[in-house]
Amino acid sequence: APLVFTRITELPPMTEGQLTYNLPFEFKDYLTQEKSRYYFDYAVQELVRGEDDSVTRMKLFACATLKTTIEDYRSMMNRAGFKLKLALPEEAAYAALLTDCIRRTQPESRDYCLVDVGHAGIRMFILRDDRFITRRTIDLGMLDLIRSISERQGVDEHIALTHMLSNYEGAMTDPASMDLYHRMAAEITKAVNFYNYNNRQQALRRVYLCGGGAAVGHIGDAIREVADLEVLPAADLMPDTGSDAPWLYTRALGCALQA
């Protein structure tokens, strides 16, 4: 089960107290326990106004998470000698990152697609300005590459990981590895094309790579081969942190900027 439920919803204008009361009902199809066991929060994305300039609808990014989830993170932080100050769903962390980026750089483009190439899969987050629009999950990740190397070279997955990191015997450029990169690229391209088809007034023309897989240049090369997309590192959206691998900390930096 997901640690946090998120959704974009529209509600009529109401007070903060009314919103606090009504927000749990927006998640009635997702929650598996009593609503008193959850924290609910929201961010206003847009106030829709009528002809007389009065607010007629509120577009919200809303989220819900079990209170025990927050307590688990609080306990983990305490054991490490830290104090939990802020907990954000990843969509909100990326939004905070883009809020800072837009303020600093005043970019021409308003549409962003962050592609987190992770261990178990790929997660794509599409935002317009600093407002989250949608996400897509792809069931291909670095674990698939490790397993492919493991099978081809006849070693266990732990050894295959070291072979991947060192490109032992050309593990990263083997035809099977290259085929996996192109499968990843094809799925990423399909998601971008689907978004562009359904949002013809906007157009995604570039993607920003983050996560552990962002260090694998062949993945970006494969995307460029199969799609008319500019592929950039997520570090281009981030302030200079002095990190040697900023693509690993994209969401963490978003949380820090929000805090």
Where are these regions (language model features)?
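Helical mechanochemical/support elements of P-loop NTPase systems and associated helical scaffolds
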Residues: 19, 23, 69, 141, ...
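Glycine-rich phosphate-binding loops at beta-strand->alpha-helix junctions
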Residues: 202-229
